[in-house]
Amino acid sequence: MSEPAVAQTVELESSGGGSLHIFRHRDFALFFSAASISNGGSWMQLVAVQALMYDLTHRGTWLGLSTVVSLVPAVLLTPYAGVLADRVSRQSILQITQTVQMCTAFALWGLYAGHVITPLWIIALGFVNGVATGFQTSAWQSFVPLLVPAEEMLQAVRLNSVQFTLARAIGPALGGLVVKFGGIGAAILTNAVTYVLVIFTLIIVRPRLTAMTSPDQGVLAGLMQGARYMWERRPLRLAVLLALAASTFGQALQYIASALSERLFHHSSEGNAGLLTALGVGALLSSGYTVRMGDRLRRSTQALVSIALFIASISLLSATHSYQLGQVAYFIAGVAHLQMAVALNTLIQGTVPDEYRGRAMSFYLLGILAGIPIGSQVLGSLGDVIGFRTTLVLDAAAFALVLGALVVSGWWRDLDATPEQISDGAPI
């Protein structure tokens, strides 16, 4: 199909009882629960580490730099990790990477408790954590569908997005409370302990078998094969580019929340917990709506509404001096983030065959992981130079250009592509 197709929404089978019926599968229920707790701990630590870094440096540039250093190895490794996830046990990959991340969390806590923590130590451990993230993320996303029957895969994908938003809603709020009453060290230690639960769960679950690529094929050849598969199909190519744009212009706001809390609203750096909690609550309510609506929501509609909401959120942040309105802006950003994540995630997971899924998800995640450090570094550095309000105005304007290009070109329709259109092998 060489001409733009009027795409249709994928019709998915349901086992009855709605998306929550999927929790009858023991392994999915266990992994969902453990991951929710552990990811909540990660967000708790993010609140603590952001506040710690800003208290040590009082510079938005350092916040951006710590994000860049932690995500650059993830960006560089993710495509190769996608090849790995398509040819070896995703379960084993996750067991190893979760262990590494647990060790970095305990090391960070030890340095803080020993009163020898410095910005460079935070960056160094963030780099190690980023290496683990690079190998982990593709395996995680492509592992979740293996915990349920194939016909219930997209229900699992949607609820995996809900799991992350649950963590985002609860983690920052708990992090703020733990930091206030127990200190930064308590938040970091809590996160370290939660990894034990995930590692134990990964030992006992039994994923279904799936098609894997031949190990005889070289890593570079496998990577190029996956890249061609994604590039030759415009809906998949568009998903990666939109993930990059949403991360650069929208999601990066999470990583400069400490600076915005102090510079825009004159709160302490720990005020980032309130902003991030509002973001998480927005994402949580958005996910509940998404689960109830299921397949009735068109992916193209979700994406367009998401970008419009991001622009509204950033514009409100640039204009208001009220911390409460700042929380409203982050709430709107949370709604936007969830809708974009579900739209793009289900597009790829629902149309790409198993033998390509690890690599397909790696390129999608590459867009996310590349956009966050670019956005956070640029926003943080520009904020230090020209002020955060002007920086946010420029950010909203850039995202508006993306929305305009998507609408004028008509490419937004490609987001509703069906598995049959993707499997044809011709550009849509």
Regions found by a protein language model. Name each.
Residues 1-428:
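Alpha-helical transmembrane-bundle signature of multi-pass membrane transport and export proteins
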